[in-house]
Amino acid sequence: MREMPKYVTGKKWRCMTAANWLHRQAMVASRFGHAAFDIFGVPIFGHEEDAADNFATYIMLQFGGAQARRLIGGAAWAWRAYLGDYRRNPVMQTRLAAFASDHGLPQERFYNLACLAFGANKSEFADVQSYLPPTRLPKCSYEYQTLVRAFRKEISPHIDQEMAKRVLDTDWLGSLESGPVPQK
């Protein structure tokens, strides 16, 4: 909350607070990804941080509909400041040290999240097209399906499917002020 502007009040403040909370939920889901990889011995090709981000994105998308949109939107919210308008200014300067981090650049994390969301449900996330470069859009369905196959093979066998259904059927975000509301 320290990074929130002090002058924002009212509805805009509530929206920003909710977005900040939703982004933090995505970060928690990413930590669960790291734990799952370790506990279940999931083999990782590439950066584990990218795989954990993908794990979190997959989990958020499983809620479907409005909950998935809010979760994905909250996760993307924190990276929005880094993006600007790539159409207006497609060239950016980055310090070389940023490429040495075990975490992807915020821009990369945003685009990966957006592409997976669009690949999961083109109609629900149709507005995401305007954020992704046209060269990335055709690959999004494939990227999401690759993630689905990996999750089903490496993670799903370890999940209590009945409990997962109860979790996914709960309206966790109906109101951020009140508690979760189980669906029947």
How would you name each of these model-derived features?
Residues 1-21, 32-37, 184:
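Active-site scaffold of zinc-dependent metalloenzymes
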Residues 18-26, 48-51, 73:
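Alpha-helical scaffolds flanking conserved acidic
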Residues 24-39, 54:
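Catalytic glutamate of the conserved HExxH
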Residues 39, 43-44, 66-67:
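Inter-helical turn/loop segments and adjacent helix faces that build the functional surface
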Residues 45-64:
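An active-site-proximal "capping" alpha-helix that borders the catalytic cofactor pocket
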Residues 50-55, 68-86:
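Acidic helix-start/capping segments at beta-turn-to-alpha-helix junctions
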Residues 67-79, 171-184:
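Fold-level signature of zinc-dependent metallopeptidase catalytic domains
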Residues 92-183:
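Pan-zinc metallopeptidase signature
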